[in-house]
Swiss-Prot record:
Keyword match Hydrolase: no
Name by which UniProt lists this protein: UPF0641 membrane protein PJ4664.05
Key words, A-Z: Endoplasmic reticulum, Membrane, Transmembrane, Transmembrane helix
Taxonomic source organism: Schizosaccharomyces pombe (strain 972 / ATCC 24843) (Fission yeast)
Subcellular location field: Endoplasmic reticulum membrane
One family name in Pfam for this protein: Far-17a_AIG1
Record lineage: Eukaryota, Fungi, Dikarya, Ascomycota, Taphrinomycotina
Signal sequence coordinates: none
Entry similarity comment: Belongs to the UPF0641 family.
Amino acid sequence: MSSAISRSRFNSFILHTVATANLIWAFNWINHNSDVAIRRSYGSHFQHLTVLSLAVTLLSMVVGLFSDISGSLTLVKLKNILLYIVCPLETIVSILYWSIVSYDRSLLIPKDRPVPLPLNFDISVHLMPTVYTLIDYLFFSPPFSLSIGPSLLVYLSIAVSYMLWVEKCYQMNKFYAYPILAILDPIKKTIFYTVASIISFSCYIVLKMVHPYALPSGAPPRS
């Protein structure tokens, strides 16, 4: 059993190291190649749900990395809390981003953006965080513990908070970071946010259900 735990902790260390390095690179790319108008505006890049979720994912991976090194149960529990929030959130970011850009990329990325997004960056921020958090949750963490009611409240709260934040940024900047929001009326935007929160909640439920089937035998999750 101790051998299995040590191997699991080493594999977790590798995951968190790779993820941390990749996400730091992504933030560095954003800082050096970002849209100047967005960077100088109120809220900067944190107007984007992608960047907000990326920041929480990076934090969870850094905390996970330090927990792997130190063996601290406090850090493990903190990492799990962050992961429970961001794992379904990253999943919805990937679903929404790739489905929308496959239909019309200009709905999310302005046509006049000075620096086009290279594929490696696109994948690093819109796909790999989902991969990292799913692997971490399914193979190195205990299952989600919140019941249906509280978990639904959590994701509705996140959706409402982000909606209010985006509207605050619009009041200050007079433009939306995502072009799609400029063409949706208030009712359609409310529906959009509601659907997104329901999908996030659905991801939470599905991931909670499949977790027992993902963990390898003899490798107990760290809790």
